[in-house]
């Protein structure tokens, strides 16, 4: 983080899902220095204690940023509604940017192959959290903070190479990520004032990666994932978070584009 970038994103109202750990937690820390004092960050996750702790950390380190949190299960209608209510109570105020970061997501059951998924309920539950939730949350937030001349609206979908490339035993994860990418491409086509970015952060050393290492059913893929970690070929999570924020600052991407860390 250089001095030249401090406050570069301006006055922002940001809603960040999946904020309590992993990439979301890192994004929260890296975003705060890039916004102007008086900006607001709404942290969303299922885990109340982790959110409280993160909010306290950020409040101490960045006293000029107003940090709020909402503990919500985004796989439910109630959780989405609670998040929208929390955002509405903040109001946009003097913010010149609305930034919605859809980071919450899960890898699903990677211990099974395609032919093992015979229960529709399991697939439906996965898609509720990973596809339906970001669609309904983003739609509701865009309605809550409608188009106005002095407000730039940005939507980020935290994506994956799995949105573009099939991986054996990752049928839920690949399908969910592909659906999300297309969903947000449609948003970019429909709303010409909304800047939309699907960003794939690369292989990160997170809890999700640990699940992939230990539970992936396909032995070749599992070995490749483990080898990458053992050889130190993971992406630094802070570097990836800052690349995403650099992309938002530069604002040079085509709305709806999928951009990978390695691009």
Swiss-Prot record:
Its main location: cytoplasm. GO terms for biological process: tetrahydrobiopterin biosynthetic process. GO terms for molecular function: sepiapterin reductase (NADP+) activity. One of its GO terms (cellular component) is cytoplasm. Its EC number is 1.1.1.153. Substrate binds at residues 160-161, 173, 202, 260. It catalyses: L-erythro-7,8-dihydrobiopterin + NADP(+) = L-sepiapterin + NADPH + H(+); (6R)-L-erythro-5,6,7,8-tetrahydrobiopterin + 2 NADP(+) = 6-pyruvoyl-5,6,7,8-tetrahydropterin + 2 NADPH + 2 H(+). Keywords: Cytoplasm, NADP, Oxidoreductase. NADP(+) binds at residues 18-24, 46-47, 73-74, 177, 204-209. InterPro entries: Biopterin_syn/organic_redct, NAD(P)-bd_dom_sf, SDR_fam, Sepiapterin_red. It is found in: Cytoplasm. Homodimer. NCBIfam families: sepiapter_red (TIGR01500). Belongs to the sepiapterin reductase family. Catalyzes the final one or two reductions in tetra-hydrobiopterin biosynthesis to form 5,6,7,8-tetrahydrobiopterin. This is Sepiapterin reductase. It comes from Xenopus laevis. The gene is spr.
